[in-house]
Amino acid sequence: MRNLGLLEITLLCSLFVYFRIDSVSSLNSDGLALLSLLKHFDKVPLEVASTWKENTSETTPCNNNWFGVICDLSGNVVETLNLSASGLSGQLGSEIGELKSLVTLDLSLNSFSGLLPSTLGNCTSLEYLDLSNNDFSGEVPDIFGSLQNLTFLYLDRNNLSGLIPASVGGLIELVDLRMSYNNLSGTIPELLGNCSKLEYLALNNNKLNGSLPASLYLLENLGELFVSNNSLGGRLHFGSSNCKKLVSLDLSFNDFQGGVPPEIGNCSSLHSLVMVKCNLTGTIPSSMGMLRKVSVIDLSDNRLSGNIPQELGNCSSLETLKLNDNQLQGEIPPALSKLKKLQSLELFFNKLSGEIPIGIWKIQSLTQMLVYNNTLTGELPVEVTQLKHLKKLTLFNNGFYGDIPMSLGLNRSLEEVDLLGNRFTGEIPPHLCHGQKLRLFILGSNQLHGKIPASIRQCKTLERVRLEDNKLSGVLPEFPESLSLSYVNLGSNSFEGSIPRSLGSCKNLLTIDLSQNKLTGLIPPELGNLQSLGLLNLSHNYLEGPLPSQLSGCARLLYFDVGSNSLNGSIPSSFRSWKSLSTLVLSDNNFLGAIPQFLAELDRLSDLRIARNAFGGKIPSSVGLLKSLRYGLDLSANVFTGEIPTTLGALINLERLNISNNKLTGPLSVLQSLKSLNQVDVSYNQFTGPIPVNLLSNSSKFSGNPDLCIQASYSVSAIIRKEFKSCKGQVKLSTWKIALIAAGSSLSVLALLFALFLVLCRCKRGTKTEDANILAEEGLSLLLNKVLAATDNLDDKYIIGRGAHGVVYRASLGSGEEYAVKKLIFAEHIRANQNMKREIETIGLVRHRNLIRLERFWMRKEDGLMLYQYMPNGSLHDVLHRGNQGEAVLDWSARFNIALGISHGLAYLHHDCHPPIIHRDIKPENILMDSDMEPHIGDFGLARILDDSTVSTATVTGTTGYIAPENAYKTVRSKESDVYSYGVVLLELVTGKRALDRSFPEDINIVSWVRSVLSSYEDEDDTAGPIVDPKLVDELLDTKLREQAIQVTDLALRCTDKRPENRPSMRDVVKDLTDLESFVRSTSGSVH
């Protein structure tokens, strides 16, 4: 009985196992394949996890409503797998190939990664394959030979690389192919022309090269073609074949040759023609007038020239016409007035002239008129006031004149009015903000008069108000309480009355400039409510009373200037909250009392000017704690007493010091440690003792201090020694010492005469030596002999550089003495050399921490030798563009400091040298880097000096890529030319690219490349994003550093403005960078 029981139990277990296994295996192959796929998914949404399950009663996934699964009519095989936008991640397993009846596969908008499985080729019934918007990588598998039914193929927006498989050309049923936004390379397959049913082709935003295949032009059904943002070249042939169905064509950001195809007019169905920055040349073909259906024409940022063809007026469906950033000239054709559907006319940055045809101002559909930076003239007609949809009227930097129509704004649609830099006269129209939409109110730099309309107080949408440099008068209106207003500049007018208190209610104001007016009364304490304010300039007015302590609420203030008013009292102690302040100007007022001790807490202060007040007492030692002081310290014309505090010697970065016209006493010895000083004025005090030798070569002023003297041991020019008496109290020599000196001198004279006799004898015999070639007035030099010995008489093996002005050698004299020797080759006219000698002696007196210091100069018959300290890190060009593999990447902070240092040096040449020195050839090769990566400008002054003296002088001075447009064919240079070159260097620092980079299309430089990229970039506030050096991407994830890069880019674009008068001075550049340096430390915002 017992054995029988065991047998029954065994049979029952066997049956259970049998039926269990049978139930598992009952799920068909498609179901098992799906479950296998599930194992490769990292993240599975609930809809999938809860429905993709084994069920003992079902044999197919079709009967249990598996999420995303659709089967055929029989309910046995899977035909559709649609998991689009399901939040899936992981990989696509090879089991996908087991779904052999699959017709539709849509896994788009997920986070799949890894390779595309080659087993997809087994899904031979596939008609629709969408794997777009994932993170697939690797090459596209060559599987399309077996997918003959494929009609829609979407692989766009992944990280796929490699070539486009030629087998795609065998997909004869293909209608829609999208592979854009990947990293595909190589050429577009010629076989793609076999896809005769193809209607939509998107290959944009890859790395494709070569020409568009000829077969592509034969696709008669092609309606939309997108190949922008590649490296395609060759000539374009659209219109030469049947393109009647082509609706959209975008070829932007490639490097094609030639111009717009003259036959393009044959593509009569075109709705959108976009060819931005394609390197197009030549003229705009008149055949484009045949495009009656086209609504968008964008040929911006090319090199198109000639006139705008009048035939464009036949494009009766045109809504957007963008021809900006080309070289178009002549007048705007009146035929454009026929474009009754035109909404946006963008012709800025060309060479257009004449008046805008009156008919264009009558196109009622116009929303944007952007024609700035041309040479257009004429008056603004009253018809502009009748454009009910006009949003943007941007005409700045032209030659428009006359009155602005008084009814402008009654059309209620205006959002931006920018007429800056024209010759408009008359009054400001009173209804500009009638529609309560106006954001930009910019009428600066015109000849407007009258008052600001009172209606401005109701305009709550304003963001920027610029009315500076006009002839406006009257009382400033009250401003509405606003959270959008960020910028107000009403400077350089004749406004009277008090500062509106209502400005204090505009909580997001970043900049207020009311300088150079006739404002009176007190500074309103309500301005202290502006917690984001970065710049407040109230200088050159008639303001009075004390500084309100409430201004301490402006905790982010960078720049505070109330100079040239009638303010009085002392500096409120509450201003210690200005921790970010970089510039403080209180000059030319009636302030009194001592310099407050709390100023030492403003450790980012780089410029302090409190001249011509009634400050008194001793200069506090705490001033020496202002380690960031660099641009200037001006305490002149006050009543300070006592000695200069020794702590002042800690201000090692200070470049300008003015303590003149006080009652200071004692020695100047503390100033000898200030190595960066390039301008000093200590005149009209009561200083005593020797003048520090480091100050004697600067633009220093010492008059009015009768007890100052020069040490007899100082090696200074005869002119300087003549101006000052020698210091007294030197040890009197005894009679026997005098006798010895006299005897020694006599022997020296005899030896010198003998040596001169030998030299003359050698010359008569025709013996040539290096020293014999030195001009007599220069004398012989022991140091020169050392230099020649160290370089084997300037042997080529010691060459470390060649430039436009000569060859540079490295001379190692031992004991750590390293020099760079520049050899200049002269022409044979000695008179020019004598002039050069005087000029170079002048250069030798120039001292600045960011300029290469000329140590010695020797003039010889055929050349001159200039001796400089050797710079171990080479040039900025070497550091930025030729970094060794092992070298660290030049990070953004270092690049910013380099930009700031160069600006300081160039500003000194332009504004602190008399006469000013124009460099003429600013470029990275002429900027040398010391061991601390501090930049030093070299070759300053040489371009002008050598113009008439060197063998190699060219007609046009400067280097291609750095020459300002106005100097392309001229030898005359100006400060503005240097500013342009500096702007190019800034762009190199931001982008990491050369001025003429190999990656640019032919004849494109870095300035035009940056402008073109930014013109098509969607985020107008992020000017650094699309151009920044890829090596900086990680570092610039820091919001503050990124903002700094954006502002530097904007500054570079201003420096490289086509019009010299629009460029900032180098002093302005220094100010902007210094303020930005401080501002970025404290906030991620920016001053606009």
From Swiss-Prot:
LRR repeats, residue ranges: 75-99, 100-122, 123-146, 147-170, 172-194, 195-219, 221-243, 244-267, 269-291, 292-315, 316-339, 341-363, 365-387, 388-411, 412-435, 436-459, 460-485, 487-506, 507-529, 530-554, 556-577, 578-602, 603-627, 629-651, 652-676, 678-698
Keywords (A to Z) from UniProt: ATP-binding, Cell membrane, Glycoprotein, Kinase, Leucine-rich repeat, Membrane, Nucleotide-binding, Phosphoprotein, Plant defense, Receptor, Repeat, Serine/threonine-protein kinase, Signal, Transferase, Transmembrane, Transmembrane helix
Subunit description: Interacts with BAK1. Interacts with CLE14.
Modification sites for Phosphothreonine: 791
Active-site residues (renumbered): 921 (proton acceptor)
Record topology, Cytoplasmic segments: 761-1088
Primary location: membrane
Localization: Cell membrane
The name this protein goes by in its record: Leucine-rich repeat receptor-like protein kinase PEPR2
Encoding gene per record: PEPR2
Extracellular side: 27-739
Keyword match Nucleotide-binding: yes
Modified residues (Phosphotyrosine): 868, 908, 962, 969
GO biological process: defense response to bacterium; response to jasmonic acid; response to wounding
Any one of the GO CC terms: plasma membrane
Pfam families assigned to the protein according to its UniProt record, in alphabetical order: LRR_1, LRR_8, LRRNT_2, Pkinase
Family as reported in the entry's similarity comment: Belongs to the protein kinase superfamily. Ser/Thr protein kinase family.
GO molecular function annotation: ATP binding; peptide binding; protein serine kinase activity; protein serine/threonine kinase activity
Domain Protein kinase: 794-1080
PROSITE patterns from the UniProt entry: LRR, PROTEIN_KINASE_ATP, PROTEIN_KINASE_DOM, PROTEIN_KINASE_ST
Transmembrane portions of the chain: 740-760
Protein residues bound to ATP: 800-808, 822
EC identifiers of the protein: 2.7.11.1
